[in-house]
Amino acid sequence: MSLTVQTEQRGDMVVVSVAGELDMATAPQLQDQISDLLEKGRTRLVFDLAEVSFCDSTGLSVFVRAKNSTDDAGGTVRLAAPQRGVLRILEVSGLVEVLHTYPTVDEAVTASEPALD
C-alpha cells in the first residue's frame, strides 16, 4: 500500500496529514517531507494519524527522529488521532509517554505542553 502525505499551516503549527501504511517501504517518503519542513524552519509539527492503518518500528523511528530534531530547534512534535492499532503500538513501545499524543488534530494544535495520554 502507498502512503500519502499532505501539509497544512495552522497558526504556528504545521499539520502533517499521513494516510496509508507507514512501514519500511514508505517511511522514507515521510522522512523526506519532515526533512524539507525542518530545512524551512518549520519545527512545530502535528502528525494527523487518523488515516494511518498500520505503523511498524520503522515508522515509529521517523517520529522519534522528528521529535529529536524539533526538540534541538526549540520546536515540538505532536501526534493526533491515531487509530486503535497505531495507538496500541505507541503504548506497547512506551512512545506514548515520549511523543505527545492527542485524540484530535484540533486538540493537538491548540494544546499547551505537555500532551494528554
Segments (PLM) and residue ranges:
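A generic structural signal for alpha->beta connector loops
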Residues: 2-4, 12, 74, 98-99
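Acidic phosphotransfer microenvironment of two-component signaling modules
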Residues: 84, 106-107
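Residues at or immediately preceding the N-termini of alpha-helices
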Residues: 27, 105-106
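Intrinsically disordered or compositionally simple regulatory linkers and C-terminal tails
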Residues: 110-117
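Amphipathic alpha-helical interaction surfaces in cytosolic regulatory modules
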Residues: 22-99
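Conserved catalytic submotifs in the C-terminal HATPase_c
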Residues: 10-11, 50, 106
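Short acidic-hydrophobic, aromatic-tinged amphipathic segments that line or gate anion-handling sites
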Residues: 100-104
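STAS-typified acidic loop motif
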Residues: 3-32
